[in-house]
Amino acid sequence: MKRYAYIVVLLFFITTSLSAQIKIGNYRFKDGAEYTGELKGKRPNGKGKTVFLSGDIYEGEYVKGKRQGEGTYLFHDGEKYVGEWFNDQQHGKGTFHFMNNNRYEGMWYADYQEGEG
């Protein structure tokens, strides 16, 4: 019984400390872009939205202040990328919607289309 109580208390403290690390707030990048969303250690980490000075908007996941995971980037001219990100770059599976209604659906590597799609 003591072992069970110990495990319950330990799990409580672990979940409490983890949830305390993530908070909702705002962050301004060096280039002036404004982020609103989950923060960890004063940096974007988790889900959030960034509005860039150009008018571009990114909504999706961040890890240690960089776009990483699933996200959507809407360019100010109406073009859009929906897909995976790694280290602030389009990387992995994704779809790019062009202004002329064409689209590329396929793999991306370091911001470049990989293959024919």
Report each predicted region and the residues it spans:
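N-terminal segments that cap or nucleate solenoid repeat domains
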Residues: 20-57
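Conserved anchor residues at repeat-unit boundaries in beta-strand-based tandem repeats, strongest
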Residues: 34-44, 57-68, 80-91, 103-115
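Sec-dependent N-terminal signal peptides
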Residues: 4-14
